[in-house]
Amino acid sequence: MVHVVFEGVDFGGKGICLKAIKDYELNKGDKHIFDIDEFQNKFGRNPVPGEFPNSPLVVIYSEPTFAGVGKLLRDQILKDKDVDHSVDIEAEAFALDRRMLFEQTFRGLITRSEKDLSILGSRGIISSLVYQGGRIVSESGNSYNEARDEILSIPGNYYVWTNFMPDAVGITVVNDVNQLLKRGEEREKKDGAKYETAENLIRISKMYTDPKLLEDLKRKTTIEIIDAEQSVDHTQSQAIDIWKKYTER
């Protein structure tokens, strides 16, 4: 099994990376592509292992998910401008959504399909360390280490941190906040309005390359930095190269 996740600030190019890899695998045609996002949008739940075909698989997923707690996060908690949800509610919701996906779907699937399984993710526990961990630092004045420990103490996060970290994480980097804002204006669907202000985009973008975060991550996974400031083609090429590096070795 190979598990690769793409991370980065909003409008930073994660979607471009995932689409490029999905198209690459579709063109190869030697594996079945199972898009969990599409399944969740259609059926309103996580798939269980028996619903995956018995063939070489590429499984694609996103966090938050599009079902259950993840849908609540997308539709209400991240977008509700009338209610300022506490960082605790936000962090615990993400952690529960994460644990349900891995317990209901991936744990059994990995046992069944260990040799012929490639998993491609958009966001994961690193987003919780950056987004909710960053909120804890900015709102309470806690140190990075204190915020990290608080995030990782939540059962769903601890479960994933100790049992299901990806083999590699591709972090898209865009240092020009004006470019991020321009991309945001051009994008029709916005997933988390409260994090898409210029102030938050700057703070979050810096956190993804913070030496303390990267030091923690390097103990658990391999980090691949993607220069996403240039052309779409350049971003896609880097993403595919990372994917091939881990899935075709």
PLM regions and their residue ranges:
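Walker A (P-loop) phosphate-binding loop of P-loop NTPases
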Residues: 11
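Conserved lysine of the Walker
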Residues: 14
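NTP-dependent small-molecule kinase module
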Residues: 20-24, 28-29, 178-249
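ATP-dependent small-molecule kinase phosphotransfer cores
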Residues: 40-153
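Short glycine-/polar-rich loops that comprise or flank the Walker A/P-loop
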Residues: 56, 164-168, 219-222
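A glycine- and Lys/Arg-enriched "phosphate-lid" helix/loop adjacent to the NTP-binding pocket
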Residues: 127-207
